[in-house]
């Protein structure tokens, strides 16, 4: 009897999860991974054309959190494809391995402003979203410098 109840409960749980998946060409919330550097990403639309995105990057020299406010727009005749851009900010911490490339710098804190521009696509009929983006940033704390190498490719699972 316990096994039957456990199997029934598991089946109901998986059925509910399947129904919660988004299979349209739009979405409200998505969670996934970003490539270069490696990141966990979550994007949530607060309005049909406005989203908040959080990225937690992990790389050789430390960790960095970036928060972004994105404005999205449709691309005519391309269902599910949107352009986006917006401002943001980051907070990061790097370790002393940074000194291998920058001998005059010690481990420390990284605070700055970011921008983002890119394309976002939601597959109709599947709970999958991909995006490609460029995320230039300017660090203003510790050492002031511009970095144009953030961004890349993201693959997300859409929840709603």
Tell me the role of every PLM-derived stretch:
Residues 22-24, 135, 140-144, 158-160:
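Outer-membrane beta-barrel porins/channels
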Residues 148-160:
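Outer-membrane beta-barrel "beta-signal"
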Residues 87, 134-136, 153-155:
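A structural signal for short, well-ordered beta-strand segments
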Residues 46, 144-147:
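Short glycine/proline-enriched turns and hinge-like loops at secondary-structure junctions
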């Amino acid at each position: 009897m316990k096994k039957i109840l456990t199997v029934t409960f598991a089946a109901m749980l998986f059925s509910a999860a399947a129904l919660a998946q988004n299979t349209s060409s739009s979405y409200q919330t998505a969670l996934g991974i970003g490539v270069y550097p490696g990141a966990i990403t979550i994007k949530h639309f607060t309005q049909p054309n406005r989203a908040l995105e959080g990225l937690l990057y992990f790389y050789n020299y430390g960790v960095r959190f970036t928060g972004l406010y994105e404005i999205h727009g449709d691309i005519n005749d391309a269902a599910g494809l949107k352009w986006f851009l917006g401002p943001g900010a980051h907070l990061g911490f790097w370790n002393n391995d940074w000194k291998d490339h920058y001998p005059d710098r010690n481990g420390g804190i990284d605070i700055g402003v970011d921008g983002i521009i890119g394309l976002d696509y939601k597959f109709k009929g599947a709970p999958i979203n991909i995006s490609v983006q460029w995320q230039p940033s300017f660090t203003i704390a510790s050492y002031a410098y511009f970095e144009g190498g953030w961004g890349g490719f993201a693959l997300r699972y859409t929840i709603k």
